[in-house]
Amino acid sequence: MTLFVCGFAEIAFMKKFLLLALLSFSAFAQTSESYRLKAAAHFENGRYKEAIAALTLAIKLNPKDVKTWRNRAITYEKTEKFDLAVKDYLEVLKYDPSGETLGAIGFDYLVLEKYEEARKHLQQAITLLPTNINFRYNLALSHQYEKNYALAIEAYDEALKVDRYHTTSLFSKIRCLLRLEKFDVASVLVDSFFVAKRFDAEMLLFRGDIKLHNGATEAALNDFTRAIAINPEDIILLIRAADCLAELSQFDEEAAVRKRIVTLMEKQGETKEYRAINYGLLGFALYNAFQWEEALENLSASITLDPSATFYFYRTAVKAKLKDYAGACEDLKKAQELNPSEAENYEGYFADTAEFEEFYESCMGEV
């Protein structure tokens, strides 16, 4: 009888234990969900750091919640922490080995420049979702970034079989063709694009580059100018146009375009090396346009950012034009010091150019 009573007591205890466990799990789940909801609110308002903190707490409470792992991976991507995003997606993969998960992992590896890993996961994703154009495009990009342009073209062709109007794949394929100097093949694709009454500034850039290769500088400039009308702050287009103007000896127009370039570079926060080159090119354009004072100002800006023998040499000529022979002589010495292999040529230019005869006589004996 005692044993019988004890049995009932044990059963009652077990029921109570199970009830408490279920209640505890429910509480954890509710708390985890509340953190996930808080994270969603933070995410919507661009507070990604706070969203990550809330999702991390949710994961600690419910580590098998796939949605939370995925959300944190997406949030890490927003903060450009792609290495952490990959780790979270790999956790998701344990529970959700879908094409979407594999494709997301492949994309993050692509950004991290781990191209073999990117291809491995993207190829698996494509096997599961063969019509997903983004996976195929990213696979092609992985080859392009490694400069395997032929393989990239093959992959872009596969993407275009899925969607013949996927313009980013078409544009990237043309870039690869131009890298391989297959200008005739690229030209056919570009012309077909315009024949189909499609229009894009990027295609104008490609067509301009092809025309430049074929020596049609004025026609190329026309395409670049049309593209600039669409994208007036595109530095690449502006540089192409400026280079064409220089080739055509239209130096005043070139200088005007290069002024736009350096203004945009300052606005967009380009690297000091890139700005230095373009301040120098502006200075040289102004020199050719006989605007000595402005040329001096911009060449000096270039040298301040990143001293180079080339722009010291150009500034030598500008200072000589302005009759600052002492300053010009110092710049010539600096150019020769920075690039000894060209020292003789630098001196020879001033020796052989009649307009610098006075400067040469004043300075060359000291060099």
Question: What is each model feature region?
Answer:
Residues 31-33, 66-67, 99-100, 133-134, ...:
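Helix-start (N-cap) detector for alpha-helical repeat units in TPR-like alpha-solenoids
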Residues 32, 270-274, 329-367:
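Terminal, low-structured helical/coil segments at or just beyond the last alpha-helical repeat
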Residues 37, 71, 104-107, 138, ...:
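Canonical tetratricopeptide repeat
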Residues 44-45, 78-79, 111-112, 145-146, ...:
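Register position in tetratricopeptide repeats
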Residues 61, 94-95, 128, 162, ...:
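Structural marker of alpha-solenoid helical repeat scaffolds
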